Amino acid sequence: MAEKLKVDLVTPYKKILSEEVDEITATGALGEFSVLPGHAPFLTSLKIGELTYKKSGQIVHLALNWGYFEVEDDKVTVLVETAERADEIDLERAKAALGRAEAALKKLSPEDKDYRVMEAALERALIRMQVAGKAARK
């Protein structure tokens, strides 16, 4: 069994991360899960949420959009629409996005075709703010 996990995190635009880590935690469609070296192979979808990894005692936080997470032979591949490290998130921009999403949702009914889009925007803004707050507390 390997002592580390090799993690590659990729968006359609660039590779965000390629590192060996001790542990990784993400938000799957069925809830939060963690992976340690020696984990059984699996593939799952990710929802908008937080990804954290631990490396040499340090914990790094990222905000993720929808995607996929695969584990095989101590190699983790994360494919997502977007990913931002906590210290890269513009908190004011996230707050503005939250305000826009809340305002749009007040004007829409759940049957409206844009309602779910705005719900996702709201969720994304909340996660970005939550993750950015973790960088601010360091």
UniProtKB/Swiss-Prot annotation:
Keywords: ATP synthesis, Cell inner membrane, Cell membrane, CF(1), Hydrogen ion transport, Ion transport, Membrane, Transport. One of its GO terms (molecular function) is proton-transporting ATP synthase activity, rotational mechanism. One of its GO terms (cellular component) is plasma membrane. CDD domains: F1-ATPase_delta (cd12152). Pfam families: ATP-synt_DE (PF00401), ATP-synt_DE_N (PF02823). InterPro entries: ATP_synth_F1_dsu/esu (IPR001469), ATP_synth_F1_dsu/esu_N (IPR020546), ATP_synth_F1_esu_C (IPR020547), ATPsynth_dsu/esu_N (IPR036771). GO terms for biological process: proton motive force-driven ATP synthesis. Its main location: membrane. It is a peripheral membrane protein. The keyword Cell inner membrane applies. It is found in: Cell inner membrane. SUPFAM superfamilies: Epsilon subunit of F1F0-ATP synthase N-terminal domain. Belongs to the ATPase epsilon chain family. Produces ATP from ADP in the presence of a proton gradient across the membrane. NCBIfam families: ATP_synt_epsi (TIGR01216), PRK13446.1 (NF009980). F-type ATPases have 2 components, CF(1) - the catalytic core - and CF(0) - the membrane proton channel. CF(1) has five subunits: alpha(3), beta(3), gamma(1), delta(1), epsilon(1). CF(0) has three main subunits: a, b and c. This is ATP synthase epsilon chain. The gene is atpC.
